[in-house]
Regions:
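Active-site gating loops and adjacent loop-to-helix segments of metal-dependent hydrolytic enzymes
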Residues: 38-83, 126
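Charged catalytic cores and adjacent phosphate/nucleic-acid-binding surfaces used
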Residues: 4-46, 99, 104-107, 114-180
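Internal catalytic-core helix/loop-beta-alpha segment
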Residues: 76-78, 82-114
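Short low-complexity stretches enriched in small and charged residues
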Residues: 59-68, 88-95, 112-118, 133
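Metal-associated gating/positioning segment near the N- to mid-region
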Residues: 1
Length: 180
């Protein structure tokens, strides 16, 4: 969360194995809602990362509690470590994310809106129209029709499915296509 510093390695590995890796970040907003932010290039992602670094509390990570926060190269070798705790909320508002990410040649959409934690719907009860999202992410097992009943604002949005996996071995093998 709140970093793109491992995207250069991920993109290199993807290129070597013929897998498309889209540079991105799962941002934690001021409202403690997670938003997926995807970028055209690694450079755009890293520029956004720099912006986010200036908007995250300077709380030191405690690896014994929260785990290590390493930056790795394409060979899984440690090349750096992030000292600030990354799981905290930034001071970036959910209503500002879409326009902000666009400035960095990216797109953004609220993550796992069907979940009871760290989703915009859990935090605010709905997706605010001021946020101007045109898509939203549902978890793999979510009932899209039920979610649309609970959150009518989803009717006008493209719904994407994702596992919210944070480790490769937890990613499903299903393939999805998004026309860009």
């Amino acid at each position: 969360h709140n970093t793109c510093r491992n995207t250069p390695a991920a993109v290199k590995v993807g290129q070597a194995t013929d897998v498309l890796v889209i540079p991105g970040m799962e941002l934690c907003t001021a409202e403690e809602a997670h938003v997926v932010c995807l970028f055209e290039t690694v450079e755009d992602a890293l520029a956004f990362d720099k912006y986010v670094c200036a908007h995250i509390p300077k709380v030191p990570n405690r690896p014994e509690i929260f785990g290590e926060q390493w930056v790795l190269n394409e060979n899984d070798e440690k090349i750096g470590e992030i000292s600030e705790l990354l799981i905290t909320a930034t001071d970036i508002s959910i209503n500002d994310v879409q326009a902000l990410v666009k400035e960095f040649n990216g797109v953004a959409f609220p993550a796992h809106v069907d979940k009871d934690a760290y989703s915009v719907t859990a935090s605010l009860g709905a997706i605010p129209p001021e946020a101007q999202f045109s898509a939203a992410e549902l978890s793999l097992t979510a009932d899209a029709a039920q979610q649309r009943l609970l959150h009518p604002e989803l009717e006008s949005m493209m719904l994407l499915r994702s596992s919210d996996a944070h480790y490769l071995h937890l990613m499903p093998e299903e393939h999805q296509t998004v026309e860009l």
